[in-house]
Amino acid sequence: MGKIILFEDVEFGGKKLELETSVSDLNVHGFNDIVSSIIVESGTWFVFDDEGFSGPSYKLTPGKYPNPGSWGGNDDELSSVKQQ
């Protein structure tokens, strides 16, 4: 099982959301279109700009992603996450 932590602000600041399962709509957790940094503690994850695991996606492996540029995305656009 993997774990990903999403943060509202760059450099791991603001509100955070810890997940261990895929989420097709981050709005359920109040995290739609606000993610600005990510820590992947374990597993491989795909993050998507649109809900329902659609739109542009980015593959993330364990590590720290302090800003959207570090995963190749744009600020405040993520809407779903899927564990591989």
Swiss-Prot record:
Q: In which tissues is it expressed?
A: Palps of larvae and otolith of the light-sensing ocellus.
Q: Which SUPFAM superfamilies match?
A: gamma-Crystallin-like (SSF49695)
| Positions of region (Disordered) | 64-84
Q: Which residues cross the membrane?
A: none
Report the domain remarks. Has a single-domain beta-structure, folded into two very similar Greek key motifs.
Subunit notes for this chain? Monomer.
Q: Function, please?
A: Structural component of the neuroectodermal visual system.
Name of the featured protein: Beta/gamma-crystallin
Q: Which organism is it from?
A: Ciona intestinalis
